[in-house]
UniProtKB/Swiss-Prot annotation:
Its main location: membrane. Residues 888-901 have a biased composition (Basic residues). It catalyses: ATP + H2O + cellular proteinSide 1 = ADP + phosphate + cellular proteinSide 2. SUPFAM superfamilies: Helical scaffold and wing domains of SecA, P-loop containing nucleoside triphosphate hydrolases, Pre-protein crosslinking domain of SecA. It comes from Haemophilus influenzae (strain ATCC 51907 / DSM 11121 / KW20 / Rd). This is Protein translocase subunit SecA. InterPro entries: Helicase_ATP-bd, Helicase_C-like, P-loop_NTPase, SEC_C_motif, SecA, SecA_CS, SecA_DEAD, SecA_motor_DEAD. Belongs to the SecA family. Monomer and homodimer. Part of the essential Sec protein translocation apparatus which comprises SecA, SecYEG and auxiliary proteins SecDF-YajC and YidC. Forms a complex with SecB. Its cofactor is Zn(2+). Pfam families: P-loop_SecA, SEC-C, SecA_DEAD, SecA_PP_bind, SecA_SW.
Length: 901
C-alpha cells in the first residue's frame, strides 16, 4: 500500500465515504416518509415526474426517491433496505458496477435505481442470465413497483408479438440478455415499423454482469437462415479422423514428428502437419472427394479443408459431457462458465455439424448469417449501463477498458466470517478424490452440509460414482439435471446434505442454512397454518444444527481458469455473516496445471511428492496457481479485446445499415432518396463511357447505348441525337438521359398511382438492402477467417481488415444503389386492359396446346403475360416463354418433356 493510499484511502474508500453522506440524508427522511399515508406515498411518483419535467435532475431527487422506495418496500414486501443496499443503489445509478457479496440482497437493491431512472419514462431493462431469474425477480418486485404506479414487464423466449410489445412498453422490463439482443436484431429485420418491439435503449441494469459482459462476451448473437446442405460431406470426412495420429510438438527444422496433427489447447485449435496433409489428401482422392494431383490448400478446395478442420477439432478438442451433452438425438452445448445447457445454441464454422457427425446423430444443414451482434457491442448501445455481481473486482480493469464502467466494492451488512482454507495438492486425481471423500465423510458425520464444485458434467458424474461406492447419499446438479435446479439448491443447506454442482449451476439462488422451509411449503397443496408453523420449527432446529457444525462447507475439486469463478463458488458460503468454510483440492493432472504450467515446473512439483497419496500445502503452491490463473485471465482478456477491435469495424457498418433501415421504415415516402440515387447511378454509368472533361473522340456511344438497353431496358438513339444536334455536349447529354429516365418513371407512377409506387419503392429498397447485407456478412466472415495470413507479408492484419472491409462496404453500398435503380427502371407496369388481354391470350394458347395434345403443367400457378400468336406453324425457341402459361422458359417446361419423348 502506497503512502498516498494510507493517507487519503483507496479510490473505493473515497467513493464510499462520499455516498455515505447521501445515506445519512436518506435516513433522516425516514420518519417523515413513515408518517405518509399510502395514497400520499403513491403520489410521490407523479410529483417526481413533474419535478423532472420542470428541470430538476435525477441526482437532485435521488434521496427522496430512495426514501420513497425504502418506505414502500417496508409496507409492501416487509423488507427494509439496509444502508449498504442504499449505497449499492447509488453506485448503480452512476453507471458503475456494484460488487455485492452473495446474500446481500442484490434483487432488492436493484429496485432503487430502477424506480429512479424509470421516472424519466424511457424504460428500464433489468437483465438476467436465464428465464427463471427474470420471472422470479419480476414477480418478487412487481407488488412494490405497482404500488408506486410503475408497470412491470417480463421478456423471455416464446412470447407472442403482442406480449413482447407489452413487456417493452412497461416502465421496468425484466429480460434475459439473449432475448434482448435477439429482439434488437429482429427489429432490424422488420419490414414495417409496427413489427418492431424495442423502444430507445435507455438504461440497462445487468445482474451477474461478469457472466454476461465477460464470460459471454465472445459469444455472438446470430440470426441465420439455411445455407447449402453439405451434411453428407461431414459424415464422410468424419470417418477419416480416427485414423489420424496426434503429434505433441509442431514440426521445426530441428524436430520432425511422426504424427498427423498438433493441438493448441489454449486457443482450442488443431493444425495438420505436412505428413497429416498428405495422408488426408490421399484419403480424399481415394474416396473420390478430390481429384488426383490437387492440394487441400488450393483455393478450389477451401470447402473441403473447412470440413476436415471442423471434424478434426470436433474429435480432438470437444468432449462429450464436458463441452456438450447428447440429449434426445441432439447436441446441446454446455456453458463452460456456468455448467448450464444452452438449448437452441449452435457452434458456428461447421463445428456443430462435425460434432453431430462424430456422435452419429442427425446432421443439420449449415446456416448463413442474416444478422449478428456481440454482447459487447449490444450493451454499449445503451445510454446508461450498470451492473451488479458478487465477483467483479478481479475483472475491474476489463470493465473499465471495454465498457467504461468503474467497479465499486460494496461493504457487507455484517462482517464475513467464512474460513477459506489453504489449497491442497495431490500427485494424481485418484489421490485427490480419496481426500475429497474423506472430507465429505467428516462433514456428514458432524451434520455439516457440503457443496462440491466440479468443472464439467463428466467430473461431477465421476465423483458421484465414487460417493455411491462410499455409500454417501448426495444430489447432483449439472447440465443433465438442470430442471431440478431450484429444488436441489433448496435442499443443499440441510444438515449432512451433500450436493455436487458443475461450476456455478444454481447461481442466483441462495443456499439457506437448515434448508428452505418456503420451498417445502410450496410443494404442499393449500398448506394450513399448522403445517407452515411445523415447517418453520423444523427449519429453526436444522438451522441451529448447521450453524453449530460450521455452516456450509465448500469443496472445489480443481481450480478454474479464472479466479473469479473460484470466488463465485466460495461465495455460496458465508452469506450475511453466516459461518462457513471452503477448500480447493488439486492434482497435477488438472487441466489448469497441464495446459498452463511448463514441463519443468510440473516435474519439480512431482519430485516434491515422496509418499504415495500425501498432500502438499505451501505458499509456493499458491503462487504457482495464482501465476497460472493470471496467465489464463490475460490470455482471455486479450482474446476478448482482440475480438472487440475486429467487431468494432463490423459494428460501425451495422450501425450505418440499421440507421438507413430504420429511416426507411419510419418514412412512407422515400422518393427524394430514390431520385438522388437515380442521379448517382446514371451519372456513374455515363462516366464509364463518357469520362468527365473528355474529348468527343474518347466517347464510347455504342457501348453506352448497349449498357442502357441491357441494364435499364432504355432504347435511346444517342448516336442520332449527336448527329442531329451539334450543340449537345457532355453535361447536356447527361441531363437528357437522366430526364428521360425520370420521365419514363413518372409515366409508370401515373399508371399505378403515387401511393402504390411509394410502397413499391420502399419494398424494393428494403429487400435489396437485406439481401446485400446478408451477403456482405458472409464475405466479412470469410475475410475475418483468413486475414491473419497477411501477417506473413509483414502487414498488420487488423489494419488490413479495416481497409478491406471498408472497401467491401463501399462496394456493397454502390451495388445497393445500382440494383434498386435497375429494378425500379426495368419494372413494367400494365394497365387493366393489358392484363385482361394477356389473360385471354393465355387461355387461347392453353386451348391450342390441348388441341396439339401437349399436357398443361398442373403445378403452374403463374400466368405469363404475352401477345396472342399462332405457335402451331413454327418451332418454339428454347429460351422463349412456354406457351402453357407456366411462366417458365420452354426448355425448362414442356420443351424438356418433348426432348425426353
Amino acid at each position: 500500500m502506497s503512502i498516498l493510499t494510507r493517507i487519503f484511502g483507496s479510490r473505493n474508500e473515497r467513493v464510499l465515504r462520499k455516498l455515505k453522506k447521501q445515506v445519512v440524508k436518506i435516513n433522516k427522511m425516514e420518519p417523515a416518509f413513515e408518517a405518509l399515508s399510502d395514497d400520499e406515498l403513491k403520489a410521490k411518483t407523479q410529483e417526481f415526474r413533474d419535478r423532472l419535467s420542470g428541470g430538476e435532475t435525477l441526482q437532485q431527487i435521488l434521496p427522496e426517491a430512495f426514501a420513497t422506495v425504502r418506505e414502500a418496500s417496508k409496507r409492501v414486501l416487509g423488507m427494509r433496505h439496509f444502508d449498504v443496499q442504499l449505497i449499492g443503489g447509488m453506485v448503480l445509478t452512476n453507471r458503475c458496477i456494484a460488487e455485492m457479496r452473495t446474500g446481500e440482497g442484490k434483487t432488492l437493491t436493484a429496485t432503487l435505481p430502477c424506480y429512479l431512472i424509470a421516472l424519466e419514462g424511457k424504460g428500464v431493462h433489468v437483465v438476467t442470465v436465464n428465464d427463471y431469474l427474470a420471472r422470479r425477480d419480476a414477480e418478487t418486485n412487481r407488488p412494490l413497483f405497482e404500488f408506486l404506479g410503475m408497470s412491470v414487464g417480463v421478456n423471455i423466449p416464446g412470447l407472442s408479438p403482442e406480449e413482447k410489445r407489452a413487456a417493452y412498453a412497461a416502465d421496468i422490463t425484466y429480460a434475459t440478455n439473449s432475448e434482448l439482443g435477439f429482439d434488437y436484431l429482429r427489429d432490424n429485420l422488420a419490414h414495417s415499423k409496427e413489427e418492431r418491439f424495442q423502444r430507445t435503449l435507455g438504461y440497462a441494469l445487468v445482474d451477474e454482469v461478469d457472466s454476461i459482459l465477460i464470460d459471454e462476451a465472445r459469444t455472438p448473437l446470430i440470426i441465420s437462415g439455411q445455407a447449402e446442405n453439405s451434411s453428407e460431406l461431414y459424415i464422410a470426412v468424419n470417418k477419416l479422423i480416427p485414423s489420424l495420429i496426434k503429434q505433441e510438438k509442431e514440426d521445426t527444422e530441428e524436430y520432425q514428428g511422426e504424427g498427423d496433427f498438433t493441438l493448441d489447447l489454449k486457443s482450442k485449435q488443431a493444425h495438420l502437419t505436412e505428413r497429416g496433409q498428405e495422408k488426408v489428401e490421399d484419403w480424399l482422392i481415394a474416396q473420390g472427394l478430390m481429384p488426383e494431383g490437387d492440394s487441400l490448400y488450393s483455393p478450389s478446395r477451401i470447402v473441403l479443408l473447412h470440413h476436415v478442420m471442423a471434424a478434426l477439432r470436433a474429435h480432438t478438442l470437444f468432449e462429450k459431457d464436458v463441452d456438450y451433452i447428447v440429449k434426445d438425438g441432439e447436441i446441446v452445448i454446455v456453458d463452460e462458465h456456468t455448467g448450464r445447457t444452452m438449448a437452441g445454441r449452435r457452434w458456428s464454422d461447421g463445428l456443430h455439424q462435425a460434432i453431430e457427425a462424430k456422435e452419429g446423430v442427425d446432421v443439420k444443414s449449415e446456416n448463413q448469417t442474416v444478422a449478428s451482434i456481440s454482447y459487447q457491442n449490444y450493451f454499449r448501445l445503451y445510454e446508461r449501463l450498470a451492473g451488479m455481481t458478487g465477483t467483479a473486482d478481479t475483472e475491474a480493469f476489463e470493465f473499465q477498458q471495454i465498457y467504461g464502467l468503474e467497479t465499486v466494492v460494496i461493504p457487507t451488512n455484517r462482517p464475513m466470517i467464512r474460513d477459506d482454507r489453504t489449497d491442497v495438492m495431490f500427485e494424481n486425481e485418484q489421490y485427490k478424490f480419496n481426500a475429497i471423500i474423506e472430507d465429505i465423510k467428516d462433514c456428514v458425520e458432524r451434520q455439516q452440509p457440503v457443496l462440491v464444485g466440479t468443472i464439467s458434467v463428466e467430473k461431477s458424474e465421476e465423483l458421484s460414482k465414487a460417493l455411491d461406492k462410499a455409500g454417501i447419499k448426495h444430489n447432483v446438479l449439472n447440465a443433465k439435471f438442470h430442471q431440478q435446479e431450484a429444488e436441489i439448491v433448496a435442499e443443499a443447506g440441510f444438515p449432512s446434505a451433500v450436493t455436487i454442482a458443475t461450476n456455478m449451476a444454481g447461481r442466483g439462488t441462495d443456499i439457506i442454512l437448515g434448508g428452505n422451509w418456503k420451498a417445502q411449503a410450496a410443494k404442499l397443496e393449500n398448506p394450513t397454518q399448522e403445517q407452515i408453523e411445523a415447517l418453520k420449527a423444523e427449519w429453526e432446529k436444522n438451522h441451529e444444527i448447521v450453524m453449530k457444525a460450521g455452516g456450509l462447507h465448500i469443496i472445489g475439486t480443481e481450480r478454474h481458469e479464472s479466479r473469479r469463478i473460484d470466488n463465485q463458488l466460495r461465495g455460496r458460503s458465508g452469506r450475511q455473516g453466516d459461518p462457513g468454510s471452503s477448500r480447493f483440492y488439486l492434482s497435477l493432472e488438472d487441466g489448469l496445471m497441464r495446459i498452463y504450467l511448463n514441463e519443468g515446473k510440473l516435474n519439480l512439483m512431482r519430485k516434491a511428492f515422496t509418499v504415495a497419496g500425501e498432500a502438499m500445502e505451501s505458499k509456493m503452491l499458491a503462487k504457482v496457481i495464482a501465476s497460472a490463473q493470471a496467465k489464463v485471465e490475460a490470455f482471455h482478456f486479450d482474446g476478448r479485446k482482440n475480438l472487440l477491435e475486429y467487431d468494432d469495424v463490423a459494428n460501425d457498418q451495422r450501425h450505418a445499415i440499421y440507421e438507413q433501415r430504420n429511416h426507411l421504415l419510419d418514412n412512407d415516402d422515400i422518393s427524394e432518396t430514390i431520385n438522388a440515387i437515380r442521379h448517382d447511378v446514371f451519372n456513374g454509368v455515363i462516366d464509364q463511357y463518357i469520362p468527365p472533361q473528355s474529348l468527343e473522340e474518347q466517347w464510347d456511344i455504342k457501348g453506352l447505348e448497349e449498357r442502357l438497353s441491357q441494364e435499364f431496358g432504355m432504347e435511346l438513339p444517342i448516336s442520332n441525337w449527336l448527329e442531329e444536334d451539334n450543340n449537345l455536349h457532355e453535361e447536356s447529354l447527361r441531363e437528357r438521359i437522366v430526364e428521360i429516365a425520370e420521365k419514363e418513371y413518372k409515366e409508370k407512377e401515373a399508371l399505378v398511382g403515387e401511393d402504390a409506387m411509394r410502397h413499391f419503392e420502399k419494398g424494393v429498397m428494403l429487400q435489396t438492402l437485406d439481401e446485400l447485407w446478408k451477403e456482405h456478412l458472409a464475405s466479412m466472415d470469410y475475410l475475418r477467417q483468413g486475414i491473419h495470413l497477411r501477417g506473413y507479408a509483414q502487414k498488420d492484419p487488423k489494419q488490413e481488415y479495416k481497409k478491406e472491409s471498408f472497401r467491401m462496404f463501399t462496394e456493397m453500398l454502390d451495388s445497393l444503389k445500382h440494383q434498386v435503380i435497375t429494378a425500379l427502371t426495368r419494372v413494367r407496369v400494365r394497365t387493366q386492359e393489358e392484363m385482361e388481354e394477356a389473360e385471354r391470350a393465355r387461355q387461347e394458347m392453353a386451348a391450342r396446346i390441348n388441341q396439339n395434345n401437349l399436357p398443361v403443367d398442373e403445378n403452374s400457378q403463374t400466368t405469363q403475360n404475352s401477345e396472342t400468336e399462332d405457335y402451331s406453324d413454327r418451332r418454339i425457341g428454347r429460351n422463349e416463354p412456354c406457351p402453357c402459361g407456366s411462366g417458365k422458359k420452354y426448355k425448362h417446361c414442356h420443351g424438356s418433356r418433348v426432348a425426353r419423348q
